[in-house]
């Protein structure tokens, strides 16, 4: 039979509708019922007669006189006795009848029996486990933490012992291990039977790869002009010099002022009367005068007599280039004339 209290709780919190209303109505009506009082069993004449002799007469047919427990009191559940004394259940059912002296004697014998029986030893406390599922109290968490710290200390101690034992071994063991490792290495040979050293071969391949990368980087700079290369070198030298200079720049910085004085600008109005700088060191003579243009803008030597001894390719190249530019300008002008 299901528990009516459980049914009423489920109906109140989880159900709805006529079924829930019926369950709640039945539960409320059952709560109004008045509990029946338990009647005490009257002692019969036989028990009064036997009180003088100290004997107990009990008939199985008299159990109907004891009122049954109401089902509403405990919901149909029978109480379970977990850790009671051996004679407690018998004392509830049977009642001893006799003189007070007889009861005192029995009490004395029971005391002596309890003193003679050895007290059970207390159960050993379980060691706190480091890991435990479910909810834990503060004491259990503290015990788990202490157990974890103790385990770490034991592991550290065992590791230190192993290291000390390994360090105390003689050097002969290292030699034996080295020989064993060398014996286990694979030996590679070529077609002629010569041993191939893989480490040396790998080092040679790395050296060749470095040389290839260096040549590739040098080959990439071939298409660049000498002026750009000189500018990069000057920038690198300037960065190296700046690393040793201070951050602050003042008006009295001679090097900073000299750098700006050496700069020449085409639109400078003082270029007409300023003295020209002379490059330090000897300079080669140059051709003075005009010369026909070429693709690389290379000037002629200072001994050139002004006669063009080429095959005429440079002249035809620039004429064709000028024609294409003129045609493009005319086409653009004709397309925009009506705008």
From Swiss-Prot:
Short name of any one Pfam family annotated for the protein: Bud13
Annotated keywords: Coiled coil, Cytoplasm, mRNA processing, mRNA splicing, Nucleus, Spliceosome
Database matches in InterPro entries: Bud13, CWC26_splicing_factor
Residues forming coiled coils: 197-222
Region (Disordered): 34-195
Locations listed in the record: Cytoplasm; Nucleus
Main location: cytoplasm
A GO BP entry: mRNA splicing, via spliceosome
Bias-annotated ranges (Basic and acidic residues): 136-156
GO CC, one annotated term: cytoplasm
Domain of life: Eukaryota
Low complexity bias (residue ranges): 109-124
Function: Involved in pre-mRNA splicing.
Family label: Belongs to the CWC26 family.
UniProt subunit comment: Associated with the spliceosome.
Protein name, per record: Pre-mRNA-splicing factor CWC26
